[in-house]
Amino acid sequence: MLNAVFTFAFLLASAPPTDVTSLSWLSGRWAGSQDGTDMEEIWTDARGGTLLGMHRDVKGGKTVGFEFFRIEAVPEGLTYFASPQGRPPTPFRAVENRKDRVVFENKEHDFPTRILYWLGDGKLHARIEGTLRGQPASEEWTWSRQP
């Protein structure tokens, strides 16, 4: 009986947080520049069970890419819904959620299959990973917090 109690307590302690407020560190306006493209990512405060966000890339004064997303607490856990270029949302479930780092995964999606966010050196970093044309592929972004 005592072993069962300790096992249950351990499982609870090691389970990733399922409340969106655990991702409050994402909130704010973030901006950066990469290869001549100005990038911005904006996340709302974690309220009402969701974080809402958007990303925009501007090059030569024109928007060349955008994405809407939300992170929501659903029965299966924290889920990131990505809508690149305004397409229907694709869900990615949180497989890791710790202080200043979160990893979402959808192994059934073509690309990416993983989305990672983390804080480091006072900057927000994101990385997507997966397979393209049978080869491992990834892309990474870095933004600085804006006023």
Model-assigned labels for residue ranges:
Residues 1-8:
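Sec-dependent signal peptide recognition
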Residues 11-22:
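Cleaved targeting-peptide boundary
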Residues 20-25, 80, 139-147:
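Beta-rich carbohydrate-recognition and catalytic domains
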Residues 26-27, 32-108:
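Central antiparallel beta-sheet cores of small beta-barrel/beta-sandwich binding domains
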Residues 94, 99, 119-125, 129-147:
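Edge beta-strand at a domain terminus
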Residues 110-113:
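Charged, amphipathic alpha-helical segments
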Residues 115-117:
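Exposed beta-sheet edge/beta-hairpin loop segments within beta-rich domains
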